[in-house]
From Swiss-Prot:
The keyword Nucleotide-binding applies. Its main location: cytoplasm. This is L-aspartate oxidase 2. It is found in: Cytoplasm. Its EC number is 1.4.3.16. FAD binds at residues 22-25, 51-58, 369, 385-386. NCBIfam families: nadB. It catalyses: L-aspartate + O2 = iminosuccinate + H2O2. SUPFAM superfamilies: FAD/NAD(P)-binding domain (SSF51905), Succinate dehydrogenase/fumarate reductase flavoprotein C-terminal domain (SSF46977), Succinate dehydrogenase/fumarate reductase flavoprotein, catalytic domain (SSF56425). The gene is nadB2. It comes from Ralstonia nicotianae (strain ATCC BAA-1114 / GMI1000).
Length: 536
């Protein structure tokens, strides 16, 4: 990718803190930052589109006398398969009760039974510890917090803009370049503190559980700003996506299996007892691979999930939204088995950060799914993600408050257009490459083919695109490439990464890809980007 000749000065807006993203981690951060800070939130979405909004199952927290922190920690470490940071796990788990109480205070209408918060159980959990809002927990939490954030006078929403590049010298950040999705106008937003809370990269897969999933843009931007990327090969595939004719209709929450749902293959055989002593409640990577194996063995596109034995009234009471969704597609969850198959659901790795979101770049923070703070390791325990979002958002706010500075107004001259090898169908190509070669089951040959396909995409005849459009293409390409590089570097199978040519575990190590500072807004250096990525 190289710069065009035409340059133009673009407008600039100045903030104390810039937040990229609008999910649960971002909202928690905003509610904990002091009102003295001028905060800008760059959001490409409407309120109902962040991944947090689509979370069905719930939020895990020790909130019962039958449970304790050590049990939750042990379950998390077991699911993480040797790659969790135990200190991070302990910190986040031990704040679970406080998190739940804080959310209640914010007006989150958790489902109750006999006056007490109803706790369900999900895969990998040894106790009932998942609080929920019916079967649409994310929506319930997000609506409550959105109402609170809307009252903050110091928060300026920059809607229908997509961040395309960080302003960084490889040591510190000074702002964000973003493109208007309405008219393509490019704007510099300057700030000494930038918080990335933009989600993961499951939108780069052909089948994903969130219809508006992020595509790794923030991960790519952070990497090009110099941030270290960790464990990006660990993409979690949710075992039970409700699919009709090859299209994902909805996630079927793990809580369905937690409340007694059973899995059957097309031969009407329960198969999970043959894969795990935990049966349907095994960790997600185990269940996803088991379903994949059954689909391969029988040549089918799905298996069956059945909870009809619990009775119509029970299912309608516990899963009203799922009953409505499945009923609308002629397959009522309360009365029939439903077809399910795995789909990309969560990015367990991400930008290397601590629990407060601090990265190796001064002023750059990463919180929520976009970050790798060490909680999830090689595989996320069900319903730990919403807990992580709140804990990281709160801790990040404290760190930002302690270190916040003042921004200098930036005047940049950008190329109006950039020469790029990418084309309008790039996303479809990337989704096919990752699904086929970095999916549920991987191989040395498949990963090699995937990397070759990526190289071929870079060798296509160059076109000239507007600056923002070219950078959006570069971001999704870089994110997909980083997944393949990370997966190829891990010569073992662990958690969400299964390579049939390296089926056993090796020594537990974190995969790290150091950041390669490359800025397309600066003159003269752009042509080196492809070579730097290939050498990463």
């Amino acid at each position: 990718m190289t710069s065009g000749q035409s340059k133009h000065e673009i407008r600039d807006m100045k903030f104390d803190v810039l937040v990229v993203g609008e999910g649960l981690a971002a909202l928690t951060l905003l509610l904990h930052l002091p009102p003295s800070l001028k905060i800008g939130v760059i959001s490409r979405n409407k309120y109902d589109e962040p991944s947090s909004y689509w979370a069905q199952g719930g939020i895990s927290a020790v909130f019962s006398t039958d449970d304790d922190h050590d049990k939750h920690i042990r379950d998390t470490l077991l699911a993480g398969d040797g790659l969790c940071d135990e200190a991070a796990v302990r910190q986040i788990v031990c704040e679970g009760g406080d998190v739940l109480r804080w959310l209640i205070d914010q007006g989150v209408p958790f489902t109750r039974e006999d006056g007490e918060i109803h706790l369900t159980r999900e895969g990998g959990h040894s106790e009932r510890r998942v609080a929920h809002v019916d079967d649409m927990t994310g929506r319930g939490i997000m609506r409550a917090l959105q109402a609170k954030v809307a009252q903050l006078p110091n928060v300026i929403w920059i809607r229908q803009y997509e961040a395309v590049e960080l302003l960084s010298d490889g040591q510190a950040v000074s702002g964000v370049i973003a493109e208007s999705l309405a008219d393509g106008e490019v704007t510099v937003f300057s700030a000494p503190t930038v918080v990335l809370a933009a989600g993961g990269l499951t939108g780069l897969y052909q089948y994903a559980t969130n219809p508006h999933a992020s595509k790794g843009e923030a991960i790519a931007m952070a990497w090009r700003a110099g941030a270290t990327i960790e464990n990006l090969e660990f993409v979690q595939f949710h075992p039970t996506a409700f699919q009709i004719e090859g299209r994902v209709i909805s996630l079927i929450t793990e809580a369905v299996r937690g409340e007694g749902g059973l899995l059957y293959n097309v031969a009407n055989e329960r198969f999970m007892p043959g894969y795990s002593s935990q049966q349907e409640l095994a960790p997600r990577d185990v269940v996803a691979r088991a379903i994949y194996s059954e689909m391969q063995a029988h040549g089918t596109s799905h298996v069956w999930l059945d909870i009809t034995h619990q009775g119509t009234a029970f299912v309608e009471q516990h899963f009203p939204n799922l009953v409505e969704i499945t009923r609308a597609h002629g397959c009522d969850l309360s009365q029939h088995r439903v077809p399910v198959s795995p789909a990309a659901h969560y990015t367990c790795g991400g930008i290397g950060a601590d629990v407060a979101g601090r990265t190796n770049i001064e002023g750059l923070y990463a919180i929520g799914e976009v970050a790798n703070c060490g909680l999830h390791g090689a595989n996320r325990l069900a319903s730990n993600s919403l807990l992580e979002c709140v804990v990281m958002g709160k801790a990040c706010a404290q760190s930002v408050t302690d270190t916040a500075g003042s921004a200098s107004r930036l005047r940049l001259t950008l190329p109006e257009r950039i020469e790029t090898p990418f084309h309008p169908n790039l996303l479809a190509d990337l989704r096919a490459i990752l699904w086929n070669h970095a999916g549920i089951v991987r191989s040395n040959t498949g990963l090699e083919i995937g990397l070759q396909n990526m190289a071929q995409l870079q060798e296509r005849h160059a076109s000239v695109l507007p600056y923002g459009q070219a950078l959006r293409a570069q971001n999704i390409f870089d994110a997909a490439h980083l997944v393949l590089l990370s997966a190829a570097a891990r010569k073992e199978s662990r958690g969400g990464h299964f390579n049939k040519d390296h089926a056993d575990k090796a020594e537990a190590q974190t995969t790290q890809i150091p950041g390669v500072p490359v800025n397309f807004w600066a003159a003269g250096e752009n042509a080196s980007h492809a070579a730097q990525l290939a050498a990463a």
